[in-house]
Amino acid sequence: LSKDTFIFELKQNGLVIQSGIFKTSVEPGTTKTMPVQFKQINTPGYYTKTIYYKTPLGIQSFDQQVFEVKQDQPKEQAMLVVEGKETIGIQFIDTEYLFDKRKGLVSIQVNDEEILKQAPKPVFYRALTDNDRGAKQTYANWLNASLFQNVVDFKMIRNSKCAQMIYTIQLESIEEECKLVYTVYNNQSIQIQLHLDKNSQRQTLPLFGIEFALKKEFKNFAYFGKGEKDTYIDRDHALTDFYFENVDTNYIPYLKPQEHGNHTDCKWCSLSNDTIQVNIKSEKMECMASKYSFMHLYNANHTFELPQTNTTHLRITKQQMGVGGINSWGAKVQPQYLIDQSKNLDFTCTLYISKKD
């Protein structure tokens, strides 16, 4: 190892705040411990501690720790809740949320500027990959469960700190229900919870999450997670960092359009236009942003068949099954990379709005 180099690096919110290089010599068949003194951290933010092992031919491997120093909650504001026959409006000084009792969160306005194109929906399906097709997996029940949803019950719970909207949604194709819960706090944030009861007898579940449809101007995508290339649960040997994409250019032109653009082990992501940033955070999630929905990709046989769109789609998931194909094409996803449906599925994330400088 005497010719090899170790590099250590500490990043805060994607910026290097400490780095260094050291070498060592280890006799064959022995081990040696080398202490690395990182700075004490107390400033809020997302951090990575990374050590790279580099030979004269280049970097060979790395090890990494990821952690967050949480910041204080935003200040509470006056929150006005107005309930009508079909809708519930929640108003702050410059932000307003509108919930339809049959459709969900149908509007987010900041200074009278609309952000959403459609209400967020639970999503359980992905555009089939070449490996899915090769393994003759269609997951048809989950396609229909993502497309055909019916709110069968709604209720609101209100207290001095928050207003909670609880939707019970019938998934016709699997004859089961899921729950989608929005909790609006008086700091303007929305906690979003998705729940599906356990059932190990179901068809393989491709993914479990929520898809948002925003106006196309929200095309600047950022995330803190594994990147910068696509990562999946069985393809996630990547560095955690802050990465940036533009949904106008992040499409991958496979011969047949298919699932792409996923990022694992994310803690935060955002979509922004010139003035407003929509943020979503979670302890652990997977995310992707695209100008195409999974149905756009699913329906097209060739890239030229994809439509011109006026929407940015953001998919946030607890987990997506792996992509499989360990024999290069057609092999089913290995069991350890499938979603475990023998346990209840619960996913929680928080949405909040910020203004760009």
What is each stretch, according to the model?
Residues L1-L98, I192:
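Carbohydrate-binding surfaces of carbohydrate-active enzymes
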Residues P74-D357:
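Beta-strand/loop-rich accessory regions of lumenal/periplasmic or secreted enzymes
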